Amino acid sequence: MLNIGFGNRVAAHRVVAIVTPNTSPMKRLKDEAKKAGRLVDATCGRKTRAILVMDSNHVILSAIQADTLAQRYAAVKEKKEEGTHNEPE
């Protein structure tokens, strides 16, 4: 599970992209997801600092910086890989 802030978590294996919300394409993506009912706002009223795109086409807004989420994502993936490669010594 990937912590996206304020007690909210998402399944890390379902994350397709972690992007910054400042660009026009990301603003359009957010607006289209809202119209389609696929937008999840996990900012708790704070400024959106990252957008997560999921494999189900859901778009999740987070108040945590995209770089921070990317580091957390990498740590989760690394921890998972260590757990799956337990070879006897």
Curated annotation (Swiss-Prot):
Organism: Desulfatibacillum aliphaticivorans
Tree of life domain: Bacteria
Protein name: Putative regulatory protein Dalk_1931
Family listed: Belongs to the RemA family.
Pfam family, one: RemA-like
